Curated annotation (Swiss-Prot):
Name of the protein in question: ATP-dependent protease ATPase subunit HslU
Intracellular or extracellular location(s): Cytoplasm
One record GO biological process: proteolysis involved in protein catabolic process
UniProt GO cellular component terms: HslUV protease complex
InterPro entries: AAA+_ATPase, ATP-dep_Clp_protease_ClpX, ATPase_AAA_core, Clp_ATPase_C, HslU, P-loop_NTPase
PANTHER family, alphabetized: ATP-DEPENDENT CLP PROTEASE ATP-BINDING SUBUNIT CLPX-LIKE, MITOCHONDRIAL-RELATED, ATP-DEPENDENT PROTEASE ATPASE SUBUNIT HSLU
SUPFAM superfamilies hit by this protein: P-loop containing nucleoside triphosphate hydrolases
Organism field: Shewanella halifaxensis (strain HAW-EB4)
């Protein structure tokens, strides 16, 4: 689990996302509260439930990007799902309980990686011995007379192996043969049953080994994984993963506005209000049956987000509104924000294009007025047509760089300066003509 302070979390998000300080502060506090809760006494810890968040804002302002970056910072089981992928129980489509099953799978993977790190040294030693055994088979006769000589030779080869001198040499080793995969086609909504059937068939076959010939470098990696998996206790792994999900799990529900009931619709709405009703027990706290064991959702943090352009938060059913107590509104982006997005974040769009063209030997220089013009063009198109936020910059930049990208391989060693005049020549007609903007930008 991350032990970063709220200020450190916001600072880290600032290097990738421009503006939206209120949203950053809310998710930073929520993430830090996960750590604070774990410092409490066990009886009080059970009573402290997470304060779920609802992020509201137009498309392309950073809601999903905040989730992506948060996943890397959290160091905890994290899953991002689209609310529109689910339907009410009993209908064709995914059930919402699949969210928790996927989150548990994520925790299993995370826990396994942590346990492999802990036993990596022992696994490396065991893998090294197996490679040396393959290189220097033990003599069948006169074992006592050759013992000292064999040991000395083994140490010489061990030194060469560690220095990488034997990386390209091929050896034959016995490795665990992968279990025969059995693909079972299932209708939507029955993924859990399919997974359990596949696991059952895979566990029925004995773990046979297979002799393979490969370079030592490749064999060493394979043997480390094999030896590490032998050192891991699978039951302990499942227990730790379930504990991790229950205490630190985070679910990001994107596009939650798309499951709001529309005023004009009538009859059963299985992919809208039905999904909201099914989400209620998950968010409130229930027990979900997964193939790894029972998972309680009482302390899982839910962060929901939506543009709410065709609906409003009050269109959610009241019970779900009450379970998302923290509301954060994200601001629409201005031309000034677009300029900052082009230059300030780590691996910004301008940096990416400079690096891409650099692979062809072409040097690109963006001037201050050139960046201003790009930002202004993107903002104008957003104002005149659909406002898709920062995503418009990708479209505008791709259009701007199209000619240069096509001819770059023939212009090695050249220097191109992208200033206001260059931007005007490339984009002016498209920006001014609303019909062209609507279809091309």
């Amino acid at each position: 689990m991350s032990e970063m302070t709220p200020r450190e979390i916001v600072h880290e998000l600032d290097s990738h996302i421009i503006g939206q300080q209120k949203a950053k502060r809310s998710v930073a506090i929520a993430l830090r509260n996960r750590w604070r809760r774990m410092q409490l006494a066990a009886d009080l810890r059970q009573e402290v439930t997470p304060k779920n968040i609802l992020m509201i804002g137009p498309t392309g302002v950073g809601k999903t990007e905040i989730a992506r970056r948060l996943a890397r910072l959290a160091k905890a089981p994290f899953i991002k799902v689209e609310a529109t992928k689910f339907t009410e129980v009993g209908y064709v489509g995914k059930e919402v309980e699949q969210i928790i099953r996927d989150l548990t799978d994520s925790a299993i993977k995370l826990t396994r990686e942590e346990q492999i790190k802990k036993c990596k040294f022992r696994a490396e030693e065991a893998a090294e011995e197996r490679i040396l055994d393959a290189l220097l088979p033990k003599p069948k006769e006169d074992w006592d007379s050759e013992k000292s000589d064999g040991s000395a030779t083994r140490q010489i080869f061990r030194k060469k192996l560690r220095e990488g001198q034997l990386d390209d040499k091929e050896i034959e080793i016995d490795v665990s043969a992968p279990q025969a995969g059995i693909e079972i086609m299932s209708p939507p909504g029955m993924e859990e049953m399919t997974n359990q059937l596949q696991s059952m068939f895979q566990n029925m076959g004995p773990g046979a080994s297979k002799r393979r010939k490969m370079p030592i470098k490749e064999a060493y990696k394979l043997l480390i994984e094999e030896e590490a998996s032998k050192l891991i206790n699978q039951e302990d792994l499942k227990e730790q993963a379930i504990e991790l999900v229950e205490q630190h799990g985070i679910v990001f529900l994107d596009e939650i506005d798309k499951i709001c009931k529309r005023g004009e619709s009538s009859g059963p709405d299985v992919s809208r209000e039905g999904v909201q009703r099914d989400l209620l027990p998950l968010v409130e706290g229930c027990t979900v049956n997964t193939k790894h064991g029972m998972v309680k959702t009482d302390h899982i943090l839910f962060i929901a987000s939506g543009a709410f352009q065709m609906s409003k938060p009050s269109d959610l059913i009241p019970e779900l509104q009450g379970r998302l107590p923290i509301r954060v509104e994200l601001d629409a982006l201005s031309a000034g924000d677009f300029k900052r997005i082009l230059t300030e974040p780590h691996a910004s769009l301008t940096e990416q294009y400079i690096a891409l063209m650099g692979t062809e030997g072409v040097t690109i220089e963006f001037t201050e007025d050139g960046i201003d013009s790009i930002a202004e063009a993107a903002w104008q198109v957003n104002e005149r047509t659909e406002n898709i936020g920062a995503r418009r910059l990708h479209t505008v930049m791709e259009r701007l760089m199209e000619e240069l990208s096509f001819e770059a391989s023939d212009k090695s060693g050249s220097v191109t300066v992208i200033d206001a005049a260059y931007v005007k020549a490339s984009l002016d007609n498209l920006v001014q003509d609303e019909d062209l903007s609507r279809y091309i930008l």
